[in-house]
């Protein structure tokens, strides 16, 4: 995703959850973290197959580090990765013109305020409930109980994200045709999934 999309989703995730109060973060530093991985060109391609260690390391940093400055930045970086994990351009190995076109059009539509999360949100919620239940949490979608039984919270969060990424790819497989890079529907889907996952993972980090 382009920087404006990362910033917009990061801001919404912050406003629509208790992240800001629970973590006592610096908003400007957090927002910089939301775009930082795209500034450092040494980083690998931002899909879930290329960055599992980096993602888990940042989850662990949120648990161990007490510095408000570092935690604010790290949370933003986590949100950046989540946005890219649920963006088709980062999942279909599209490195060239189509990737660039998709991001440019998304940026344009965001500026015109033509993009809002679509009705796939209910489907995302049902997949999330399945994801939590699939990890043998007694058939409940109570995420706090799920995490209490886990020793390595960072690994478990990553596995939930990975599960959801697989569901996302299955969902968009039949929808994304040759013209996916200009599809407004695909942009709606990506924004819906990205925002939902940023909110849920943010809640898990503070659990």
Task: Name every feature range the model reports, one short phrase each.
Residues 1-77, 82-207:
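N-terminal leader/auxiliary helical segments
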């Amino acid at each position: 995703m382009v920087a404006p999309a990362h910033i917009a989703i990061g801001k919404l995730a912050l406003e629509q959850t208790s992240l800001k109060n629970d973590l006592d973060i610096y908003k400007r530093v957090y927002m910089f973290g939301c775009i930082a991985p795209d500034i450092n060109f040494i980083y690998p391609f931002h899909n879930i197959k290329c960055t599992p260690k980096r993602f888990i390391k940042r989850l662990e940093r949120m648990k161990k580090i007490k510095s408000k400055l570092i935690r604010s930045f790290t949370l933003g970086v986590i949100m950046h990765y989540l946005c890219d994990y649920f963006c088709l351009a980062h999942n279909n190995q599209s490195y060239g013109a189509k990737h660039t076109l998709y991001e440019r059009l998304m940026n344009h539509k965001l500026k015109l305020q033509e993009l809002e999360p679509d009705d796939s949100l209910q489907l995302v919620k049902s997949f999330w409930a399945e994801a939590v239940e699939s990890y043998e949490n007694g058939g409940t979608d109570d995420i706090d109980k799920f995490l209490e039984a886990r020793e390595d919270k960072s690994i478990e969060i990553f596995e939930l994200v990975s599960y959801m990424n697989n569901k996302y790819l299955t969902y968009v497989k039949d929808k994304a045709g040759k013209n996916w890079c200009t599809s407004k529907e695909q942009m709606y889907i990506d924004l819906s999934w990205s925002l939902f996952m940023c909110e849920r993972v943010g809640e898990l980090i503070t659990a």
